[in-house]
């Protein structure tokens, strides 16, 4: 992560800006985490090809300190993200009698995966080896944003094989698969706008949230927006990542 430190700190008047904020409430829906980052899949003759949209920064697994109900409760207490989306690129046909399969080959220990919801698999169902689930899923070609989570913050990655297989997932002879690796950035507290860089935009964004007593400026997570949060953010900003 690049660091571009501002040389001058912004002043504030604590007495005018101290404000209490309400504790986190029960959230209705989990957050995707940012702009969609597509994993494009297409057929080139007897081969499947994949390409990740690199115009969108690497996602960050984030803990929003929220509580979710129902099936989404599997994300409670985790750092999670759902920006990666499998999507078919162009127009092409699957070989007769075949389906598209996505299989996890390897990954950082502790990375959990849950279905984004398909015609056959309800949302938040464990997939890709999570909770003893199969390492592969069948994909119908519709845009699919699965949920990726971890109980500890950090950089994570997972490598997948996309291939043509029969109804049981056995690869079809004569067709080449595609291998693709998805990555998630290490969470950096000073990257306020979560664009993957630390610069003046982060400082300005935090200062604006602080002045508005926005809960997003509760840097230390104690339920209040006050000088302790400003000092904490300033220290993290100067330290970089």
Give the predicted meaning of each segment.
Residues 13-22:
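Bacterial N-terminal signal peptides
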Residues 27-145, 161-187:
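Contiguous segments within soluble domain cores/interaction surfaces
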Residues 144, 152-156:
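Short tyrosine-centred short linear motifs in exposed loops/low-complexity segments
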Residues 156-172, 216-225:
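Short, charge- and proline-biased low-complexity linear segments
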